[in-house]
Amino acid sequence: MATTAQYLPRGPGGGAGGTGPLMHPDAAAAAAAAAERLHAGAAYREVQKLMHHEWLGAGAGHPVGLAHPQWLPTGGGGGGDWAGGPHLEHGKAGGGGTGRADDGGGGGGFHARLVHQGAAHAGAAWAQGGTAHHLGPAMSPSPGAGGGHQPQPLGLYAQAAYPGGGGGGLAGMLAAGGGGAGPGLHHALHEDGHEAQLEPSPPPHLGAHGHAHGHAHAGGLHAAAAHLHPGAGGGGSSVGEHSDEDAPSSDDLEQFAKQFKQRRIKLGFTQADVGLALGTLYGNVFSQTTICRFEALQLSFKNMCKLKPLLNKWLEETDSSSGSPTNLDKIAAQGRKRKKRTSIEVGVKGALESHFLKCPKPSAHEITGLADSLQLEKEVVRVWFCNRRQKEKRMTPAAGAGHPPMDDVYAPGELGPGGGSASPPSAPPPPPPAALHHHHHHTLPGSVQ
């Protein structure tokens, strides 16, 4: 285990007296010599051999023979110094219960792919420069990223996990001052497009290209949403706008209603005439109340818009036929279907009144005979009797609404000269309300009854 720790890279501390999280305490002296050999450029083959043979020979499925690798997070919160670091929080969030930064499969399979596919790339990257200089910025948390939401370690692991990353992807990520990111990093950003959008600022090792890629992905999502919902944007047009353009405005409706009322009165038509004429000409019968509410702007906007073209057509029809009085009389006759009010002479009314006193509700045969004798229409006689019965019902409750007089309750001889009761009546009326509680009073002894 001490021999294995010689070839592990140090943290940003670098020296032998540092406290790097990956350094075993028993290998402090050998770490400096291992770093110098890595700088020489020949030790990466030994590291590659170590990664292929010794890391895979570890027990319990973990590399380097440790109980748990110090640089990977644990499910229960234990482990090494880096287990709770903010740079691996993204792996904890994406890994579910195990807390490992895998790509949806098992934890052991991810480690196997990381070792087999990334061994040569990692060795080449460590051979290019100082270990502490290259590994420190890549594994350190990015300034400006909030909480523990860090997608950049996932990009590092996905570079080794996905074969499409290429040989220079990881080295380009770890190189000092590298301006661009490898294709594997773009793939990881594409897989985690939502996480890339949540970042307030691009990580330092991504550069301008990775930041532009995240913006391009977010722009693609917005473009897809705009395609699915046309008209949601500021410059889009919808069907409702076209319908609003065709509909008249409230000012137009108000002006038309005023002009229509003036024209109708000038032509000599009533509101009922207009409603019936619309039914005769266009098949839509409107009541006098509807025409009145239209002129007073009391209808809903939708109904006003529906009625306006019909009234406009009626005005045009009336104007076109204004030269010929026959057409005007025809339209007026069509509108005025209600009969005139019948005026009954005084003698005829007296005969009907005398017959009403004898029989308030005559039969159809009696109505026919009475109409023939008085030279009236049968319908006129029937309506008169109906109106007379209604008048009688209105008059009857008004006369009997008051209380009956006292003479109807008490006989004249029952009242004494002083106003008191001389003798109890044979059939006394029900007691007044004041006498209802009389039975509660007891007669005192010795009192005169």
UniProtKB/Swiss-Prot annotation:
The keyword Nucleus applies. One of its GO terms (biological process) is positive regulation of DNA-templated transcription. CDD domains: homeodomain. Residues 132-143, 218-230 have a biased composition (Low complexity). Residues 337-396 bind DNA. The keyword Secreted does not apply. Keywords: Activator, DNA-binding, Homeobox, Nucleus, Repressor, Transcription, Transcription regulation. Residues 425-434 have a biased composition (Pro residues). Residues 188-197 have a biased composition (Basic and acidic residues). Residues 1-22, 76-108, 132-152, 184-251, 393-449 are annotated as: Disordered. One of its GO terms (cellular component) is nucleoplasm. Residues 11-20, 93-108 have a biased composition (Gly residues). It is found in: Nucleus. Pfam families: Homeodomain, Pou. InterPro entries: HD, Homeobox_CS, Homeodomain-like_sf, Lambda_DNA-bd_dom_sf, POU, POU_dom, POU_domain_TF, TF_POU_3. Residues 245-319 form the POU-specific domain. GO terms for molecular function: DNA binding; DNA-binding transcription factor activity, RNA polymerase II-specific; sequence-specific DNA binding; sequence-specific double-stranded DNA binding. Its main location: nucleus. Belongs to the POU transcription factor family. Class-3 subfamily. Transcription factor that binds to the octamer motif (5'-ATTTGCAT-3'). Acts as a transcriptional activator when binding cooperatively with SOX4, SOX11, or SOX12 to gene promoters. Acts as a transcriptional repressor of myelin-specific genes. This is POU domain, class 3, transcription factor 1. The lineage of its organism: Eukaryota, Metazoa, Chordata, Craniata, Vertebrata. The gene is Pou3f1.
